[in-house]
Protein backbone atom coordinates (compact mmCIF):
# COMPACT_ATOMS: atom_id res chain seq x y z
CA UNK A 1 0.00 0.00 0.00
CA UNK A 2 1.66 3.30 -1.06
CA UNK A 3 1.27 5.32 2.13
CA UNK A 4 3.02 8.65 2.50
CA UNK A 5 4.47 10.56 5.44
CA UNK A 6 2.32 13.62 6.17
CA UNK A 7 3.18 15.31 9.47
CA UNK A 8 4.99 14.93 12.79
CA UNK A 9 4.97 16.60 16.20
CA UNK A 10 6.05 16.10 19.78
CA UNK A 11 3.41 14.48 21.99
CA UNK A 12 3.64 14.61 25.78
CA UNK A 13 1.71 11.70 27.31
CA UNK A 14 1.03 10.24 30.73
CA UNK A 15 3.79 7.74 29.95
CA UNK A 16 6.46 10.19 28.78
CA UNK A 17 7.19 12.36 25.76
CA UNK A 18 6.92 10.80 22.31
CA UNK A 19 6.92 11.94 18.71
CA UNK A 20 3.74 11.32 16.73
CA UNK A 21 3.94 10.93 12.96
CA UNK A 22 1.02 10.53 10.57
CA UNK A 23 1.12 8.51 7.36
CA UNK A 24 -1.70 8.52 4.81
CA UNK A 25 -2.86 6.37 1.92
CA UNK A 26 -3.27 8.93 -0.90
CA UNK A 27 -6.01 6.86 -2.53
CA UNK A 28 -8.25 5.99 0.42
CA UNK A 29 -7.27 8.77 2.81
CA UNK A 30 -6.71 6.17 5.52
CA UNK A 31 -4.31 7.43 8.19
CA UNK A 32 -1.87 5.43 10.31
CA UNK A 33 0.29 6.66 13.17
CA UNK A 34 3.81 6.03 14.40
CA UNK A 35 4.34 6.92 18.05
CA UNK A 36 8.09 6.93 18.55
CA UNK A 37 10.76 7.79 21.08
CA UNK A 38 14.53 8.11 20.86
CA UNK A 39 14.70 7.86 17.07
CA UNK A 40 16.01 11.32 16.27
CA UNK A 41 19.08 9.62 14.82
CA UNK A 42 19.15 6.32 12.88
CA UNK A 43 19.30 3.51 15.46
CA UNK A 44 22.32 1.22 15.56
CA UNK A 45 20.67 -1.50 17.66
CA UNK A 46 17.36 -3.38 17.32
CA UNK A 47 14.40 -1.20 18.29
CA UNK A 48 11.39 -2.10 20.41
CA UNK A 49 8.37 -2.09 18.09
CA UNK A 50 4.70 -2.83 18.62
CA UNK A 51 2.22 -3.13 15.76
CA UNK A 52 -1.07 -2.14 17.39
CA UNK A 53 -4.40 -2.14 15.57
CA UNK A 54 -6.93 0.51 16.50
CA UNK A 55 -9.43 -0.51 19.17
CA UNK A 56 -11.81 2.31 20.05
CA UNK A 57 -13.55 0.35 22.78
CA UNK A 58 -10.36 -0.82 24.46
CA UNK A 59 -7.98 2.05 23.79
CA UNK A 60 -10.39 4.95 24.40
CA UNK A 61 -13.21 3.53 26.53
CA UNK A 62 -11.21 1.05 28.67
CA UNK A 63 -13.40 -1.88 27.63
CA UNK A 64 -12.85 -5.07 29.61
CA UNK A 65 -13.87 -7.28 26.67
CA UNK A 66 -10.30 -7.26 25.28
CA UNK A 67 -6.72 -6.58 26.37
CA UNK A 68 -5.97 -3.85 23.80
CA UNK A 69 -5.97 -0.83 26.11
CA UNK A 70 -3.67 -2.40 28.71
CA UNK A 71 -1.36 -3.63 25.94
CA UNK A 72 -1.08 -0.13 24.46
CA UNK A 73 -0.39 1.50 27.82
CA UNK A 74 2.10 -1.19 28.87
CA UNK A 75 3.95 -0.69 25.59
CA UNK A 76 4.16 3.07 26.07
CA UNK A 77 5.59 2.50 29.55
CA UNK A 78 8.07 -0.07 28.25
CA UNK A 79 9.30 2.16 25.44
CA UNK A 80 9.57 5.17 27.72
CA UNK A 81 11.64 3.17 30.21
CA UNK A 82 13.88 1.86 27.42
CA UNK A 83 14.29 5.35 26.00
CA UNK A 84 13.68 4.14 22.45
CA UNK A 85 10.95 2.42 20.48
CA UNK A 86 7.95 2.84 18.23
CA UNK A 87 4.27 1.92 18.20
CA UNK A 88 2.78 1.52 14.74
CA UNK A 89 -0.86 2.37 15.40
CA UNK A 90 -2.80 1.00 12.44
CA UNK A 91 -6.36 2.14 11.75
CA UNK A 92 -7.76 -1.37 11.44
CA UNK A 93 -10.62 -1.39 13.90
CA UNK A 94 -12.02 -4.78 14.89
CA UNK A 95 -9.14 -6.78 13.37
CA UNK A 96 -9.90 -5.02 10.10
CA UNK A 97 -13.68 -5.48 9.87
CA UNK A 98 -14.57 -1.95 11.03
CA UNK A 99 -16.35 -0.57 14.07
CA UNK A 100 -19.92 -1.38 13.04
CA UNK A 101 -19.15 -5.00 12.28
CA UNK A 102 -17.08 -5.26 15.45
CA UNK A 103 -20.09 -4.21 17.54
CA UNK A 104 -22.26 -6.67 15.63
CA UNK A 105 -19.68 -9.34 16.49
CA UNK A 106 -19.79 -8.25 20.13
CA UNK A 107 -23.55 -8.80 20.11
CA UNK A 108 -22.97 -12.36 18.90
CA UNK A 109 -20.35 -12.84 21.61
CA UNK A 110 -22.97 -11.76 24.14
CA UNK A 111 -24.98 -14.75 22.90
CA UNK A 112 -22.10 -17.13 23.65
CA UNK A 113 -20.08 -17.22 20.41
CA UNK A 114 -16.33 -16.72 20.59
CA UNK A 115 -14.50 -13.91 18.78
CA UNK A 116 -13.64 -16.10 15.77
CA UNK A 117 -17.09 -17.61 15.25
CA UNK A 118 -18.76 -14.23 15.73
CA UNK A 119 -16.87 -12.85 12.73
CA UNK A 120 -17.52 -15.94 10.65
CA UNK A 121 -21.26 -15.79 11.41
CA UNK A 122 -21.21 -12.30 9.89
CA UNK A 123 -19.54 -13.76 6.77
CA UNK A 124 -16.36 -11.92 7.66
CA UNK A 125 -12.81 -13.24 8.12
CA UNK A 126 -11.58 -13.93 11.63
CA UNK A 127 -8.76 -11.48 10.94
CA UNK A 128 -8.86 -9.05 8.01
CA UNK A 129 -5.82 -6.95 8.92
CA UNK A 130 -2.95 -6.04 6.61
CA UNK A 131 0.57 -5.08 7.58
CA UNK A 132 2.09 -3.95 4.29
CA UNK A 133 2.28 -0.34 5.51
CA UNK A 134 4.64 -1.25 8.35
CA UNK A 135 7.80 -1.41 6.26
CA UNK A 136 7.19 2.08 4.83
CA UNK A 137 6.63 3.53 8.30
CA UNK A 138 9.68 1.83 9.79
CA UNK A 139 11.82 2.78 6.81
CA UNK A 140 10.87 6.43 7.31
CA UNK A 141 12.10 6.11 10.91
CA UNK A 142 15.30 4.36 9.72
CA UNK A 143 14.42 1.23 11.72
CA UNK A 144 15.84 -1.93 10.16
CA UNK A 145 15.98 -4.39 13.07
CA UNK A 146 13.22 -4.81 15.62
CA UNK A 147 12.39 -6.48 18.88
CA UNK A 148 8.69 -7.04 18.29
CA UNK A 149 6.35 -6.62 21.24
CA UNK A 150 3.65 -9.15 20.41
CA UNK A 151 1.98 -12.46 21.16
CA UNK A 152 0.83 -12.84 17.55
CA UNK A 153 3.04 -14.97 15.25
CA UNK A 154 1.27 -13.58 12.16
CA UNK A 155 2.71 -10.14 12.91
CA UNK A 156 6.20 -11.58 13.22
CA UNK A 157 5.89 -13.29 9.85
CA UNK A 158 4.29 -10.25 8.22
CA UNK A 159 7.23 -8.05 9.15
CA UNK A 160 9.75 -10.67 8.07
CA UNK A 161 7.97 -10.96 4.72
CA UNK A 162 8.56 -7.23 4.22
CA UNK A 163 12.28 -7.60 4.77
CA UNK A 164 12.29 -6.36 8.36
CA UNK A 165 14.74 -8.21 10.58
CA UNK A 166 12.81 -9.37 13.66
CA UNK A 167 15.61 -10.32 16.03
CA UNK A 168 13.48 -11.04 19.09
CA UNK A 169 9.93 -11.28 20.39
CA UNK A 170 8.94 -9.48 23.57
CA UNK A 171 5.87 -11.14 25.16
CA UNK A 172 3.09 -8.87 26.39
CA UNK A 173 0.62 -10.45 28.79
CA UNK A 174 -1.44 -7.79 30.55
CA UNK A 175 -5.07 -6.87 31.06
CA UNK A 176 -6.58 -10.24 31.93
CA UNK A 177 -9.93 -9.94 33.70
CA UNK A 178 -13.11 -12.04 34.13
CA UNK A 179 -14.73 -10.42 31.08
CA UNK A 180 -11.98 -11.30 28.60
CA UNK A 181 -10.67 -14.67 29.82
CA UNK A 182 -12.53 -16.58 27.09
CA UNK A 183 -11.39 -14.08 24.47
CA UNK A 184 -7.75 -14.57 25.45
CA UNK A 185 -8.14 -18.35 25.46
CA UNK A 186 -9.67 -18.18 21.98
CA UNK A 187 -6.73 -16.14 20.73
CA UNK A 188 -4.37 -18.82 22.03
CA UNK A 189 -6.36 -21.88 20.97
CA UNK A 190 -7.81 -20.72 17.63
CA UNK A 191 -5.55 -17.89 16.48
CA UNK A 192 -2.16 -19.34 17.51
CA UNK A 193 -1.28 -16.47 19.83
CA UNK A 194 1.77 -17.26 21.92
CA UNK A 195 0.26 -17.13 25.37
CA UNK A 196 1.28 -19.70 27.95
CA UNK A 197 -1.36 -21.86 29.60
CA UNK A 198 -0.49 -20.44 33.02
CA UNK A 199 -1.26 -16.96 31.68
CA UNK A 200 -4.89 -17.95 32.18
Curated annotation (Swiss-Prot):
Its EC number is 3.5.4.25. It comes from Acinetobacter baumannii (strain SDF). Zn(2+) binds at residues 55, 66, 68. This is GTP cyclohydrolase-2. Catalyzes the conversion of GTP to 2,5-diamino-6-ribosylamino-4(3H)-pyrimidinone 5'-phosphate (DARP), formate and pyrophosphate. SUPFAM superfamilies: RibA-like. It catalyses: GTP + 4 H2O = 2,5-diamino-6-hydroxy-4-(5-phosphoribosylamino)-pyrimidine + formate + 2 phosphate + 3 H(+). GO terms for cellular component: cytosol. The active site is at 127 (proton acceptor), 129 (nucleophile). GO terms for biological process: riboflavin biosynthetic process. Binds 1 zinc ion per subunit. Its cofactor is Zn(2+).
Amino acid sequence: MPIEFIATSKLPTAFGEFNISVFQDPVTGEEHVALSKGLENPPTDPVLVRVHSECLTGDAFASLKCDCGPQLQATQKLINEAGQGVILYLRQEGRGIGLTNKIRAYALQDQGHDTVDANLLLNLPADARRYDMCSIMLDHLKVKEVKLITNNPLKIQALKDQGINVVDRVPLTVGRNPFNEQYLKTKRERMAHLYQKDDF
